[in-house]
Amino acid sequence: MTMTEKILARASGRASVRPGEDIEAKPDVVISYDFPGYTDVFFKEAREEFGVDKVADPKRFVLFIDHMIPAAAPKEEELHQNTRAWGAKQGVPVHERKGIGHQVSAELGYASPGAFIVHFDGHVSQLGAFGAYA
């Protein structure tokens, strides 16, 4: 198997996976951040459309406040406050003023060899440099 197949097999609890198969893989880390139209909408839709009000495994979820820093408008600060409040309610770590999340996530140890990482930002693929599938 390729490295990607090995990571996805482990994340799906299977001995092996092959190209073209449908699998259900559990990410090691889900990364999100304070970007209007994404994080705020995600939180709202998860609750309203799917009845999900609690992160299943807070140890696998991380939030970064790394956009619009410092907040230049009240609406930006409101988004930051809502992101902090949601993170506290969920019991997930919220990192801010440390740098860009998809870079800092590696520095903080969220990216490691063999990890399966999910994020809605395409830049997360750079975590492949650490041996992760992102």
Description of each model-found segment:
Residues 1-134:
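Fe-S-dependent hydro-lyases/dehydratases of central metabolism
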